[in-house]
Amino acid sequence: MTPGIRPLVAGNWKMNGKGESLTELRAIAAGLSSDLGRKLDAVICVPATLLSRAAETLEGETVGLGGQDAHFKTSGAHTGDISPEMLKEAGATHVILGHSERRTDHHESNKLICAKTEAAWAAGLVAIVCVGETASERKAERALDVIGDQLSGSLPDGVTAENTIIAYEPVWAIGTGLTPTVQDVRAAHAFMREQLIERFGAKGAHLRLLYGGSVKPSNAAELLGVADVDGALVGGASLKAADFLAICETYRNL
């Protein structure tokens, strides 16, 4: 944790969830309506098909709602894409950009992610920008170089703590059950903080840095207690309210 920075736990449902999944969303909102919700912020990033219904479900609740990607244009001939303005109209407050699955499956570059981030800001969305190295890059001892390049290329100059959140997700840990050591997480987050302060000054010191990659109730306390880890981007464990809330509960004792 970073003193003075309010923690955030964000859930990424990925390509999961249909109408019946809103029951889990209601349970998450109910669990965070108690004193627990005063200890942290929470956001759930659902598939685009659920956004409007999820917004209705979360009306009046403290839980934020996010999309999982957005185009850099406001409209046009981009079949299958969704603009930041569309996400905003559907009820989103946040959007994930640059997730490794987008970088890999759709060959998204840092330059493209930078353009998407600026577009998200223009629409009034908070951008959750993801960075992280592959297994081969870590084995070659290039993890920090890769993270640095992604931060440099994916972030526009207008970054503030209000419009941007950074999520470090080592690619090899996503959905595998594997997690880096506490020492590795600490080193990555310390490096990111250093790079952000060097570029953005005091603004970089106040950005929220999330850890993602096989975060679950059993390892949340260990990971979320690391210096400069200001929350988590949770994948599979966010699909079940009990698991997501158990991760949030970690902040009662940190």
Curated annotation (Swiss-Prot):
Which named protein is this? Answer: Triosephosphate isomerase
Where is substrate bound in this sequence?
A: 12-14, 175, 214, 235-236
Ranked from the top, the taxonomy reads: Bacteria, Pseudomonadati, Pseudomonadota, Alphaproteobacteria, Hyphomicrobiales
Please indicate which superkingdom the organism of origin belongs to: Bacteria
Q: Which family does it belong to?
A: Belongs to the triosephosphate isomerase family.
Its biological purpose: Involved in the gluconeogenesis. Catalyzes stereospecifically the conversion of dihydroxyacetone phosphate (DHAP) to D-glyceraldehyde-3-phosphate (G3P).
Alphabetically, which GO biological process terms does the record hold? gluconeogenesis; glyceraldehyde-3-phosphate biosynthetic process; glycerol catabolic process; glycolytic process
Q: Which reaction does it catalyse?
A: D-glyceraldehyde 3-phosphate = dihydroxyacetone phosphate
- Pfam families, sorted: TIM
Return the EC number: 5.3.1.1
Active site per database record = 99 (electrophile), 169 (proton acceptor)
